[in-house]
């Protein structure tokens, strides 16, 4: 009996990480307040909305909308993640995103552009249900 319990515990320990690495779905609409620092435009905040429209395995695509003084902007992005979603990265035509999945419905992101007008922005986003 004791051997069966030890075997069951060992089996759970081996299967636990595999179960944790099952596919993570980012599809949906995520919103939150962003804060940005830029060389030219300075500091700015506002609403950010990330919409992941499609996901195939660990790769995904979508767009990020944000509000500015000049009006709303919408930029397409493409991304991928490691098994289990521990490391998530993305890119658009100008910069690079890094993501951290806090829980099933909370996603932190930062975005960076380099060059003559560098900028960095970060936000905590919550998935709308």
Language-model segment annotations:
Residues 32, 60-64, 86-91, 107-113:
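Short hydrophobic/aromatic-rich beta-strand segments that constitute the beta-sheet cores
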Residues 22-44, 109-113:
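Tryptophan-anchored aromatic micro-motifs
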Residues 56, 83, 103-105:
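Residue-level recognition of beta-strand termini and adjacent short loop/turns
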Residues 15-17:
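N-terminal signal peptide c-region/cleavage motif recognized by signal peptidases
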Residues 98-102, 107-119:
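Short, exposed beta-strand-loop hairpins at the edges of beta-sheets
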């Amino acid at each position: 009996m004791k051997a069966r319990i030890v075997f069951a515990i060992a089996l759970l320990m081996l299967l636990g990480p595999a179960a944790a690495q099952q596919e993570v779905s980012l599809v949906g609409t995520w919103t939150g307040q962003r804060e940005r620092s830029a060389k030219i435009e300075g500091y700015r905040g506002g609403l950010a909305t990330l919409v992941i429209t499609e996901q195939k395995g660990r790769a995904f695509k979508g767009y990020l909308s944000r509000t500015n003084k000049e009006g709303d902007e919408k930029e397409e992005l493409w991304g991928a993640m490691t098994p289990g979603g521990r490391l998530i990265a993305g890119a658009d035509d100008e910069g690079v995103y890094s993501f951290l999945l806090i829980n099933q419905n909370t996603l932190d992101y930062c975005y960076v552009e380099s060059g003559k007008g560098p900028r960095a922005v970060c936000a905590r986003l919550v998935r709308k249900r």
